[in-house]
Amino acid sequence: MLCARRLGGLRAGLRVRRVSTRWSPVGAAFTVQPQGRRLDRSGERGGLFGVPELSAPEGFRVAQEKALRKTEQLVRRVCATPPGPQTVLIFDELSDSLCRVADLADFVKIAHPEVAFREAAEEACRSIGTMVEKLNTNVDLYQSLQRLLADKKLVDSLDPETRRVAELFMFDFEISGIHLDQEKRKRAVDLNVKILDLSSAFLMGTHFPNTIGKHLLPERIRHHFELAGDHVVVDSLRAEVPDDLELMPWDPPYYSGLIRAERFNIEPSLYCPFFSLGACMEGLSLLFNRLLGVSLYGEQPAKGEVWSEDVRKLAVVHESEGLLGYIYCDFFQRADKPHQDCHFTIRGGRLKEDGDYQLPVVVLMLNLPQSSRNLPTLLTPGMMENLFHEMGHAMHSMLGRTRYQHVTGTRCPTDFAEVPSILMEYFANDYRVVHQFARHYQTGQSLPRNMVSRLCESKKVCAAADMQLQVFYAALDQIYHGKHPLQSSTTDILRDTQERFYGLPYVPNTAWQLRFSHLVGYGAKYYSYLMSRAVASMVWRECFRQNPFNRAAGERYRREMLAHGGGREPMLMVQGMLQKCPSIDDFVNTLVSDLDLDFETFLMDST
C-alpha cells in the first residue's frame, strides 16, 4: 500500500537513537520506594518535561509568548507560499507550535501539586485558546488552504496522508463558520461560545450531589442517614429490602457483584500479591518486546523535569530503530490529584524539516496506592487491566510515525481511538500472557491458572445486560444529537428510548440524563465504545487469540494500525489488519461471541 511504503521509506531516513547507559530495567524503576526519591529543589534546575522555560510558573508566559510569536511568523509564511504540499507542512508546524504549549499546559493545570504552576498553566491554556479562535476565523489563512484544496490537479498530486490532514484543517475552519457570510459567521462563533459555556456548566452540574430533607426518605431506610442537620446527601442507593423482587435500573451492579463474589471467589486480596506494579511493568515490556520488538526502560529524570517525586520516566526503545519516545508515569495517589486514569499527549510526533523525527512524549495518569517499606505497590485485577488499557494508548502514541503531528498517535477518530487500549485488555486476560509476569511478591509462586480462568469468566456475569445498557446509551445519545428541534422533552425521549432499547423500566419522575456527563465529552459519539470493542475483539480473535506473542501479527498491527495515527481512514486500517472488509454483522457477531460462557480465549493451552 502507498501509505505503508511511504512509512517504510520515512523510517529508513530517520536517525536511529542508540541505547543509553542511563536506561535501567523497567521493573526496577517501580520497585524503588517513591518516598525514597525526593525532588532536589536546590541549585539550578531544568524545566518540566525538559522545557527550559518551565523551571518556574512564570515560564509559562515566556513559553506562550514564544509560541505566539512563532505562530505569527508561520501565518505570514503560509499566506505567502504558493499552494502545494508545503502549505500543509506549514499548517502542521503552526499547529505544533501551539499544541506543544497548550497540551503541556492542559496537563499541568490539573496535575501539578503547586497552585502557582496550575494557575500559570490555566492562563496559558486561555491565551493559546484565544489564538486558536483567531486563527480559525483568519480569512487569509483560510484562503491559503482553500486555494490548495480547490485545485483538483494539486489535490490529486498529494499523498493520502497529506490530503487527509489538509481536509482536517479545512474542517476546523468550517466548524468556526469561516466559509459563511459575515452575519452567519458571527452567529456560528456565538453558538460555539454558547456551546462551550453550556457544556462546562452541564459537566459541573453532573457531579453535584442532591440534597433532600430527611423527612422525605422512606422510614425503613431513614436510620441509615443519621446525620447532623435536616438534610442528607444522596449519591447512589440500592434496595435494602430482601423481599423486594422487582428489579430496577440501579440493581444490576449490586446483584452482579454478589454473583461474581459468590460463584467465582474473586476476592481482590487473593490476587493482589501476584500483581506487584514492578512485575506488571516487566510483563508489559516483555509483551511489547515479543510482539513489536519494543522494550521499556527506566530513565532518571533531570532536576525539575517531573512535578512529583514519585513520577517515573520511561524510554520506549525499539530493537533496531532505537529510541521511539518517552512515557512519564504519574501512577500514585497524592493530595489534590484528579481521581481519573487517563493518557495525555504532551508532544506529538512529526517529521521535522531537517529530516529528524520529533519524538512523542506522553503522560499516563493512574491512582495506585504507594508502596511501603515492607510492601510493594500491589494491584487489584481491575487495576492491572486498567494499566494494560492505558499502556495501549501510550503505545499508540509511541509507535505512530506520521509525517504530521496533527494526526499523531491517538489524534484519530473517536470510534477508533479506543481500539488499541481495549485490545490490550484481551492480552491482560490471557493466561499465557499473565503467566509471564504474575508472581507472588514474597514466594515467587505463579498465579494459578484456575484463578485467571475464574476471574475472566466472572466478567461475563450479566455482560449481556451491560452491553444492552451500552446500546441504550448510544441510541439515546444519537437521538439527542439528531435533528432539532427535538419532538419532545429530553426526559420523554429518555423514557421512550429506554422502553425500546433496555430491558428495565423507566422510573417515573427521574431525569438521570442530566448527570450523563458523556453527552458532552462523547456527544453523538457514544457508540464509539461498542465500535472500538468490536474492532478490538475481531483483531484479537483473528490475529492474536491462537498465539498472543505472534511477532508477524504484531508487526502487521504496527504497520497497518498503530503507525498511521489518525492519518488514514480507520476502516482502511482495520481492513489492512484483518485482511478483509468486515461487515456490520461481523462486528455484531464478535460482540455476541464475547458473551459466550464457553468462550475459550482465556483457557487455551500455551502449546
What are these model-predicted stretches?
Residues 2-4, 19-225:
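N-terminal helix-rich structural modules
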Residues 1-16:
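N-terminal chloroplast transit peptides
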Residues 388, 464-483, 509, 516-541, ...:
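C-terminal substrate/ligand-recognition segments
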Residues 161, 165-167, 182, 186-189, ...:
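Active-site-proximal, well-structured secondary-structure segments within enzyme catalytic domains
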Residues 288, 370, 375-398, 421, ...:
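Active-site recognition of the HExxH zinc-binding catalytic motif
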Residues 386, 390, 394-427:
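Zinc-dependent metallopeptidase catalytic helix centered on the HExxH motif
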Residues 548-607:
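C-terminal amphipathic alpha-helical interaction region
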